[in-house]
Regions:
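Acetyl-CoA-dependent GNAT
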Residues: 3-4, 10-83, 92-98, 102, ...
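Residue-level recognition of the GNAT/N-acetyltransferase active site
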Residues: 79, 83, 112-114, 139
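Short glycine/proline-centered loop/turn elements that form peptide/ligand docking sites
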Residues: 92, 115-118, 135-140
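Conserved catalytic-core motifs of GNAT/GCN5-like acyltransferases
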Residues: 108-110, 128-144
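Conserved active-site tyrosine of GNAT-family acetyltransferases
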Residues: 122, 127, 147
Length: 157
């Protein structure tokens, strides 16, 4: 499938309805519109929206929480019609560039072992498996793989 170059912007209130709909499509325990709105006020959070450059519609989004020198990717989601076109990778690249530029020690994320596409994408950006949270997800019940990319040496190079 052809790669799609999206416009990545900070999430704002205008995106919340579409992102809440995306959450419902992608996750068994979706974040609500109100939960997403709270993140707009969170000084430790960075949420990005991927927009179709032709239509301006939301095609994906991702969230990052920063605590001290640690980054936690909370969400990465892309509408099914836009998957396998590089959208999630573009979002992940922005967060990796941010982590390196801000001298974060690492970025980490959790993913279902059954989500082979997300695991492959994360590995392509240098994430490696560091652990497993047993029975972390439900609907269906599944472990979470903990994938981490270290930036300590990169940031100090």
């Amino acid at each position: 499938m052809e790669q799609m170059h999206v416009r990545i912007v900070p999430m704002n209130a205008d995106h919340l309805e579409e992102i809440a709909a995306l959450e419902r499509v992608c996750f068994s325990r979706p974040w609500s519109r109100n939960m997403l709105a709270e993140e707009l006020e969170n000084q430790c959070a960075a949420f990005l929206t991927a927009l179709d450059p032709q239509t301006g519609k939301v095609v994906g989004y991702a969230g990052l929480l920063v605590a001290a020198d640690e980054g936690y990717i909370t969400n990465v989601a892309v509408f099914p019609a836009y998957r396998r076109r590089g959208v999630a990778g573009q979002l992940l690249k922005v967060f990796c560039d941010f982590a390196a530029g801000q001298h974060l020690a690492f970025l980490t994320l959790e993913v279902r072992p059954s989500n082979e596409a997300a695991i492959a994408l994360s590995r392509s950006y240098g994430f490696t498996e560091r652990g497993r949270r047993r029975n972390y997800y439900d609907l269906p019940r599944e472990d979470a793989l903990i994938l981490t990319r270290d930036f300590g040496e990169e940031a100090n190079a």
